[in-house]
Amino acid sequence: METAEIVKIAVSAAPYSIDKPYDYLVPPELLETAVPGVRVTVPFGRGNRTSEGIILTRTPGEKMQGLKPLLSVLDRGPVLDGDGIALALWLRQRYFCTLFEAVKAILPAGLWYQIREVWHVAEGMDRCAADGAATGIRRAAPVLDALFAAGGSAELSVLEEACGKEAGTVLRALQKAGVTVCETAARRRIGDKSRRMVELAVSAEEAASLTEKRSSPQRREAVRLLAAEGRMSAAEVCYFTGVSMAALRGMEKAGIVAFSAEEELRLPDLTAVEPSGPIVLNEEQEAAFQCIRTLTKTGKPEAVLLQGVTGSGKTQVYLRLVQEILSRGRRAMVLVPEIVLTPQMMRRFSACFGDQVAMLHSSLRMTERYDQWKRIRRGEVQVVLGTRSAIFAPLKNVGLIVLDEEQESSYQSENPPRYHTRDVAKYLCARDKSTLVLGSATPAVETAWNAEHGIYHKALLRQRYNRQALPEVLVADLKQEIRAGNAGMVGQVLRTELEENLRRGEQSILLLNRRGSNRYLLCGECGHVPECPRCSVALTYHSANGRLMCHYCGHSERSSDTCPVCGGIMKHVGTGTQKVEEELHDLFPGTEVLRMDADTAAGRHEQLLDKFEREQIPILLGTQMVAKGLDFPQVTLVGVLAADLSLYVDNYRAAERTFSLLTQVVGRAGRGGSAGRAVIQTYTPENDVIQCAARQDYQGFYEREIRMRQLRRFPPFADLFTFTVSGTEEGAVLRAAVAVREELRRLCALPELAAGEPEVLGPAPAPVMKLNNRYRYRCLLVGKNDRPTREAVSWLLKAFANDRANRGMNLFVDCNSME
């Protein structure tokens, strides 16, 4: 029996339905470089199309007939180690993605290769000879037409566009017949940057002697500089001495200097910060710190909820914990939910830990993210600070992971793998026996439930750091504004408070709560909002058919212009920041308003916030990004323009999100020496969520919400699997969704699933039913996220993809989606 080296490969071209580690043969010329963790190119599928992959394992084995060989190795060394490969396998099993999708999530985007196949007509082959050799090859003529029309050479993508997807199969058949040849090239999106360095190749005395007589003054000056400074960049030598690069090359030929290349890291521009003094904690912070510090010493994986009111100084506790972890020779990771929060947090951490901190988030240039990743991988940093994807940073010996504002939905990925950062952090802490700190003033209901039942530990910060009182909150009834004939977004109560702040010269923040852009109906008299009788979520208004629909169970009813409760007029709710900005300019002529939303703030978050603080602009108007983590001492007033916009959307998390958002934004006021005030404008002032937020009463909100979730079997009492079917023909998509529902019901009757009393709902239109010309319907499985359920879900996804009736349609699944 002949033996050989066999590798298992995660192949990029493998869809989920056939995804697995594929076996390939290592050819003799690649034995030294084909090791686990390197990217490779491989032939894949019947047409042996060149595809990218990554080696997962390598073992000696039997050389089986038909086993395909690797084509090439793309990396000089592994880009994933054993821990990274294990994480990719876990992501695949947990989130129903392919192995390669998991690997791509872990590695930085700039590291990926673009595989290009260029096809040529074989040397000496004219069209007549090509036609003769291609006899019997199906559809060879149009492919040859396109190839010869392109001058005898073209990329596969160009030929596929002209002749269809089967062009690759035809070209390979022509290759076997000797008509065509293929040239494959792998090009990385970004490369390493280096700079040319120069140094003396001989002693300073000898160099001076060689340049003393016949050399120019610039050459002699270059020798003196290099003798004094040692190795320098060639550009610097030219700049300081006036010597030309050509002259330096001449000195190299003469043996006086030597050139070399040195890696140059592309690091983000950060505002310089002064080193901070000792971190001083108050009594309450010290108690929380000591509680968590004790957990970090157990040598076991631990999770703790650090719950503190807004302004209580949770960041100070994070800093002290990181300091403690670093003193023990371990490393730390601190994550924030929004890019807008990273600059302020980065300044505070850099002041404490200097260049030991690396920052990772999507607003950095791809080259900057890649170079930060390299620093982390080489062990040059001790602390990683970033947004969601920073959880995959290759940081070793991690002793602490912090998720600030852990309740935020931005911690969940919307693309495969659809992971939640909190779950990945728990996996890493279990692997590394480290501590996970979940920080929030308004923790997710599931997190609070886990802390209440002893699954997580809990530390509390009940007071603000400076002992300042929480802001006084006024709840303004917008129904009164309608009755008074005020159709604008700024009511009389808020207008009065803004006038007072302008008179005092203090700053204000206004939040337009635009989350959940779906329109809903609301009675302008009594505040009634039509809800689904089955799901306890607000019904969404569809203007196309004039109906109210539930996007969970599919319930539908005709909309009415009159309120079924009091007979009042039903109002369509929804607006935008630009309109509010215009209204503010009309109300307060000459007052500067800084608008910050997804459009105006793209890539400019830090500049806008710096301008607000530095220039003392009176009013900052924005969406959710102004609600969290910002600390401006001169802000004494916060206004919420329409609290209801996120409260009445068809999502079981609507109440939790609204309470969290209101609590967070109210907490932006009064963080300096002056008392803070807040105005919450709402059409439903008596709503329990609004009232709890006005009182900053998390416990009251939690007790109400947990009762509702237990009644409805929402998390944490069950897990919700959302199956979304999409396609270009609505009727076909709906039929496929019905088939998915029936298959789910059959699976739920199996003994291993039936014990959990699963329930199947739907199909119903997705909240955005048509996206990119694809219709979307979804079904819900209410059950338990355990191994039998995940295996059943995986089987269903593969069966759907392999069913020819579903050609042109996609099915994907989320578990406990935040959206």
PLM segments and residue spans:
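Small-residue-enriched segments and motifs
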Residues: 4-9, 24, 53, 473, ...
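Extracytoplasmic/periplasmic
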Residues: 731-746
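Short, intrinsically disordered low-complexity segments
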Residues: 39, 756-785
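Inter-lobe coupling/hinge segments of SF2-like helicase ATPases
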Residues: 272-293, 298-734, 767, 778-781, ...
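Short beta-strand elements
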Residues: 747-766, 807-814
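Residues at beta-strand starts and edge strands
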Residues: 5, 20, 38, 330, ...
